[in-house]
């Protein structure tokens, strides 16, 4: 009887040891999977991202989603269209989303307001204004002086699209307050419909909306705003400082996927990129997407890497200051966290 008890105890002990070994092995495999990008289905982490608008201007992001770059990093992305930088930042600060994707000016404003858990920019996607200036009338030989006396829909005050446009006007000898009518009464996501309904002589819109307007004879692209400026941190990813601190691995994997997306758009043709992102734009013809991407490649809008330079950040603050929207300059090393973008 005693021998039987000892035998049973021995068997139980062996089972326990084997079970513990299997658990440890499985844990190591899972950790290896996350680190290598080959993540088991049940270990994929869902991340909610609020984007400022839905545009092919952000092609590297959609490439990363559609070609599985995020999945390789163990992440599943849920995109929410915030409809403007203010809405995006509100969603981030109120913990409705994990990550915001908008102009970095939003992070500057929050820092300057003195928030203790302010937001940090951890990756930059675009380095130029991506909006196209669309005219109601066809213009064969456009110059910026033609905007004098005109009614223009440039976006909301305080946003990078508006301030960059204002900066370009000044660079071309136009006084934004006296020489034309910059109508800021219409919200960002309502500008296109307002223009189509008859409001304004010109409107600034992103692709593929600009090319769609042209195809439907509702407007004509006369200039790319970004072609008239130096490099400026136009669109970036940010999150609350506490989120970044508590989710370093997640943020690192997120940035890795964005790097892959940037590498793809900078090494492939417009047609290849269009085919990679078409599922993100089910209502847009592939030819329009291709044309829109060609426009963006022509003016070199996408970063080579997600790193934000101090020089471009300072130019952004100069533009904001000249627009009368910034009382004090925010420190680069507080608002921008390049540690993840500089990895590898």
Stretches with model-predicted labels:
Residues 1-46, 343-344:
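Short, low-complexity disordered leader/linker segments with a strong preference
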Residues 2, 38-177, 181-185, 194, ...:
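Short, glycine-/small- and polar/acidic-enriched structural segments
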Residues 27-29, 57, 106, 129, ...:
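Short phosphate-engaging motifs
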Residues 245-326:
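Secondary-structure end/capping motifs
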Residues 314-344:
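Conserved C-terminal helix/tail region of periplasmic/extracytoplasmic solute-binding proteins
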């Amino acid at each position: 009887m005693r021998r039987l008890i000892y035998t049973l105890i021995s068997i139980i002990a062996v089972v326990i040891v084997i079970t513990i070994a299997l658990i440890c092995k499985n844990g190591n495999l899972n950790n290896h999977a996350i680190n290598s990008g080959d993540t088991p289905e049940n270990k994929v982490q869902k991340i909610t991202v609020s984007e400022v608008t839905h545009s092919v201007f952000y092609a590297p992001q959609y490439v990363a989603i559609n070609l599985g770059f995020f999945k390789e990093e163990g992440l599943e992305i849920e995109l929410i269209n915030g409809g403007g930088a203010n809405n995006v930042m509100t969603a981030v600060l109120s913990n409705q989303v994990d990550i915001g994707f908008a102009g970095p000016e939003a992070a500057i404003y929050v820092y300057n307001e003195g928030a203790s858990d302010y937001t940090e920019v951890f990756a930059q996607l675009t380095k130029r204004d991506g909006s196209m200036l669309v005219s109601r009338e066809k213009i064969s030989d456009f110059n910026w002086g033609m905007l004098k006396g005109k009614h223009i829909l440039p976006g909301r005050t305080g946003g990078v699209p508006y301030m960059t446009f204002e900066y370009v006007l000044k660079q071309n000898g136009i006084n934004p307050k006296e020489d034309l009518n910059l109508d800021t009464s219409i919200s960002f996501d309502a500008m296109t419909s307002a223009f189509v309904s008859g409001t304004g002589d010109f409107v600034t819109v992103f692709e593929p909306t600009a090319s769609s307007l042209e195809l439907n004879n509702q407007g004509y692209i006369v200039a790319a705003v970004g072609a008239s400026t130096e490099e400026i941190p136009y669109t970036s990813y940010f999150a609350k400082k506490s989120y970044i601190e508590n989710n370093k691995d997640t943020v690192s994997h997120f940035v890795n996927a964005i790097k892959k997306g940037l590498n793809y758009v900078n090494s492939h043709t417009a047609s290849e990129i269009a085919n990679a992102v078409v599922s993100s734009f089910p209502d847009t013809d592939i030819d329009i997407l291709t044309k829109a991407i060609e426009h963006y490649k022509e003016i070199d809008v996408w970063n080579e890497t997600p790193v934000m330079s101090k020089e471009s950040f300072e130019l952004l603050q100069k533009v904001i200051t000249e627009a009368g929207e910034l009382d004090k300059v925010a420190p680069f090393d507080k608002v921008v966290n390049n540690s993840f973008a500089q990895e590898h």
